[in-house]
């Protein structure tokens, strides 16, 4: 068994995810095992556009964007599991969420760690469990579904 870690820098992430600024919410993948799990990070800075209005006096990352970032990490794991290479003709859509729970706020200067695990896959639909943490402390957890779709041009 190899101890080699599978990582993805931002250049590789951009090949898999269609998201771009200001909606690309994953900065790096620290490790992944196709069909099993993925560990990604998002560095949260005061320069994030959502902090202008959420909230100017006490900036907090919106919970829906924490879930979106978790869904993007899930999409990367789905791509690495259910497809061989990135393709402009294939997308993984956020198809559902269950049991989302928030435990603490995320503020500028925090580094979000996303751990997503594959639960099952059938007919292009994947079910995953994800957690977001800051400094080892649970921020959010959820079950996420994503669906593989070919894009017709």
Curated annotation (Swiss-Prot):
Gene3D superfamilies: Hotdog Thioesterase. The keyword Lipid metabolism applies. This is 3-hydroxyacyl-[acyl-carrier-protein] dehydratase FabZ. HAMAP family: FabZ (MF_00406). NCBIfam families: fabZ, PRK00006.1. Keywords: Cytoplasm, Lipid A biosynthesis, Lipid biosynthesis, Lipid metabolism, Lyase. It comes from the Bacteria. GO terms for biological process: fatty acid biosynthetic process; lipid A biosynthetic process. It comes from Shewanella amazonensis (strain ATCC BAA-1098 / SB2B). Involved in unsaturated fatty acids biosynthesis. Catalyzes the dehydration of short chain beta-hydroxyacyl-ACPs and long chain saturated and unsaturated beta-hydroxyacyl-ACPs. The active site is at residue 54. Its main location: cytoplasm. InterPro entries: FabA_FabZ, FabZ, HotDog_dom_sf. Belongs to the thioester dehydratase family. FabZ subfamily. The keyword Protease does not apply. One of its GO terms (cellular component) is membrane. Its EC number is 4.2.1.59. The gene is fabZ. It catalyses: a (3R)-hydroxyacyl-[ACP] = a (2E)-enoyl-[ACP] + H2O. It is found in: Cytoplasm. GO terms for molecular function: (3R)-hydroxyacyl-[acyl-carrier-protein] dehydratase activity. Signal peptide: none annotated.
């Amino acid at each position: 068994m190899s101890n080699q870690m599978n990582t993805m820098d931002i250049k590789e992430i951009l090949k898999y995810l269609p998201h771009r600024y200001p909606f690309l919410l994953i900065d790096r993948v620290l490790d992944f095992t196709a069909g099993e799990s993925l560990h990604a990070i998002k560095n949260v800075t005061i320069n994030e556009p959502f902090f202008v209005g959420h909230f100017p006096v006490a900036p907090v990352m919106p919970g829906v964007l924490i879930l979106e970032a978790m869904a993007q990490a899930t999409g990367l794991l789905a791509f690495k599991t259910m497809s061989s290479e990135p393709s402009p003709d294939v997308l993984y859509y956020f198809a559902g969420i269950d049991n989302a729970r928030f435990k603490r706020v995320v503020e500028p200067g925090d580094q979000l760690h996303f751990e997503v695990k594959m639960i099952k896959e059938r007919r292009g639909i994947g079910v995953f469990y994800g957690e977001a943490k800051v400094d080892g402390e649970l921020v959010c957890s959820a079950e996420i579904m994503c669906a593989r779709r070919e894009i017709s041009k």
